[in-house]
Amino acid sequence: MKNTFIWILKIFIGLIALLLLKTGFMWSFLPETNLEAHNIVTNSNLGLNMIKSEIGSGLFSVALFLLLYVIKGKKWFLPATIMVGLYLVTRTISFMVDGYHPVIVTLIVLEALILVALFALNKLQSK
């Protein structure tokens, strides 16, 4: 019975993860389509909620994983690296597609430096 429940939960969480991957792709690479499909205007209640939820929670997640890695150690290296790496990849692709802005370049450099620092710390701690 316990194993059945474990599998049901894994399937449920896996399906949610797939839905979130699709949603993340849509917001990252087709935001206009997503805004139009859901009738989201950025200065409406829904628009503000989406900005706060999608952007705010993503940044909170990155910050939390970075802090957990620094405080709690190696088991948080992979989540922190993946989160920062996804921000860097998405921002770089968006930069190539949508064009230049000095803030974008600053954030790309900062995210790359964070990744370098994560890998350097991981390497130093494994010696």
Where are these predicted regions, by residue range?
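Hydrophobic transmembrane helix segments
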Residues: 17-49
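Core segments of alpha-helical transmembrane spans in multipass integral membrane proteins
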Residues: 46-67, 82
